[in-house]
C-alpha cells in the first residue's frame, strides 16, 4: 500500500489482504521522497513511530524488540567485529546497538533515502542516540544493492540487512544475487543476518527467504521473536555463516558485556528464540 489510512478517531492503520494493524495517534509528517512515502506519527501507546509506504517500521517504545534481535546474535558470535555493514537502518537503531561493542572499529551504514535519516534524527532521536555522532559510523546515502555488488571480497565481519518488506526500494534485498554478493564480501568467521518477515502474516515469503539464504551460505537458521506493531506481532530474523552455525553460540565475554544494557536479548532468550521454530516451518525447510 502507498500510505496508511487514518480514521476520524485517530487510528492509523496498515492494511493487508483481509487484515489491518493500527495504532491510535496523530500524523506529524506525511511526505513522499524520491523513493517512498514516509509517515511519522505520535501514538498514544508506543510514542513516535515511522511508516514507509504505509507499513510500520519502528516506534520509540518497542523498537528494541527488533533491533536487539537483529544485532546481538550476530555481533556476539562473529569471530571478529572490526568492520560491520548495515544495509538500510536509516532510523539509527541498528547502528546504535552495533556501536555498543568496543571491538567495532568501522561501521558502514548504507541507506538509500536521506529523508528517512533526517526525519528519524528529528522526530525519533532516541533510536540513533549516540550513534549519529560516533566517529566509527560512516553514513553512505547510496543504494545498498549496488554497494554490496561493488564491495571488495571478504571486506566485512558482520553484515546486517535492516530493510523494509520486499517491495519498492527493498525488493532487491531478498533475491539470490544479492545474497551471493553478501556471501562474497563476508570474511571467514563472519555472520550475516537479515529480517525475514512474519511466519504468520507472510508465511511463504519467510520460508522462501530462509531456504534461499541456507542455499547460498550453507548454514542458516531463523530466530523467532515478537514486534508488537508488526503484522501478527510474530517476526523472524535469519542468521547465516559460511563455516558453521556460530551465530547460535554467543561468546561469553561479549555476551556478559552487552546483556546488562539489553531489554530483550540475552543468551538464554536467544537459545529459546532459535529453538522456537514451528513444526510447519521446520517441515518446509527439511
From Swiss-Prot:
InterPro entries linked: PABS (IPR030374), PABS_CS (IPR030373), SAM-dependent_MTases_sf (IPR029063), Spermi_synthase (IPR001045), Spermidine_synt_N (IPR035246), Spermidine_synt_N_sf (IPR037163)
Subcellular location field: Cytoplasm
Record's GO cellular component terms: cytoplasm
GO molecular function: spermidine synthase activity
Residue positions binding S-methyl-5'-thioadenosine: 36, 111, 143-144, 169
EC number: 2.5.1.16
Lineage: superkingdom: Bacteria
Record Pfam families: Spermine_synt_N (PF17284), Spermine_synth (PF01564)
Residue intervals of the PABS domain: 9-242
Active site: 162 (proton acceptor)
GO biological process, one term: spermidine biosynthetic process
The entry's keywords: Cytoplasm, Polyamine biosynthesis, Spermidine biosynthesis, Transferase
Metabolic or biological pathway: Amine and polyamine biosynthesis; spermidine biosynthesis; spermidine from putrescine: step 1/1
Binding site for spermidine: 67, 91
Enzyme class: transferase
Keyword Cytoplasm (UniProt): yes
Substrates-to-products reaction catalysed: S-adenosyl 3-(methylsulfanyl)propylamine + putrescine = S-methyl-5'-thioadenosine + spermidine + H(+)
Gene3D superfamilies: Spermidine synthase, tetramerisation domain, Vaccinia Virus protein VP39
Oligomeric and partner information: Homodimer or homotetramer.
Job of this protein: Catalyzes the irreversible transfer of a propylamine group from the amino donor S-adenosylmethioninamine (decarboxy-AdoMet) to putrescine (1,4-diaminobutane) to yield spermidine.
Family label: Belongs to the spermidine/spermine synthase family.
Protein name: Polyamine aminopropyltransferase
Organism: Prochlorococcus marinus (strain MIT 9313)
Gene that produces this protein: speE
Amino acid at each position: 500500500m502507498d500510505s496508511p489510512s487514518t480514521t476520524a478517531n485517530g487510528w492509523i492503520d496498515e492494511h493487508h489482504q483481509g487484515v489491518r494493524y493500527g495504532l491510535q495517534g496523530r500524523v506529524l509528517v506525511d511526505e513522499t521522497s524520491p523513493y517512498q512515502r514516509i509517515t511519522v506519527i505520535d501514538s498514544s501507546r508506543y510514542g513516535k513511530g515511522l511508516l514507509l509506504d504505509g507499513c510500520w517500521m519502528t516506534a520509540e517504545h518497542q523498537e528494541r524488540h527488533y533491533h536487539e534481535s537483529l544485532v546481538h546474535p550476530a555481533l556476539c558470535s562473529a569471530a571478529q567485529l572490526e568492520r560491520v555493514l548495515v544495509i538500510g537502518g536509516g532510523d539509527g537503531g541498528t547502528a546504535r546497538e552495533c556501536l555498543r561493542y568496543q571491538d567495532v572499529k568501522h561501521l558502514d551504514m548504507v541507506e538509500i533515502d536521506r529523508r528517512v535519516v533526517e526525519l528519524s534524527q528529528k522526530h525519533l532521536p532516541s533510536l540513533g542516540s549516540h550513534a549519529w555522532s560516533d566517529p566509527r559510523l560512516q553514513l553512505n546515502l547510496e543504494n545498498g544493492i549496488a554497494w554490496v555488488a561493488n564491495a571488495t571480497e571478504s571486506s566485512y565481519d558482520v553484515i546486517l540487512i535492516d530493510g523494509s518488506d520486499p517491495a519498492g526500494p527493498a525488493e532487491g534485498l531478498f533475491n539470490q544475487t544479492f545474497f551471493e554478493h553478501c556471501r562474497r564480501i563476508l570474511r571467514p568467521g563472519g555472520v550475516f543476518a537479515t529480517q525475514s518477515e512474519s511466519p504468520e502474516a507472510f508465511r511463504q515469503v519467510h520460508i522462501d527467504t530462509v531456504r534461499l539464504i541456507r542455499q547460498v551460505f550453507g548454514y542458516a537458521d531463523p530466530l523467532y521473536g515478537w514486534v508488537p506493531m508488526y503484522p501478527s506481532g510474530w517476526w523472524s530474523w535469519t542468521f547465516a555463516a559460511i563455516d558453521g552455525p556460530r551465530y547460535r553460540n554467543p561468546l561469553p565475554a561479549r555476551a556478559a558485556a552487552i546483556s546488562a544494557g539489553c531489554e530483550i536479548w540475552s543468551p538464554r532468550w536467544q537459545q529459546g528464540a532459535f529453538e522456537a521454530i514451528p513444526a510447519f516451518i521446520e517441515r518446509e525447510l527439511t
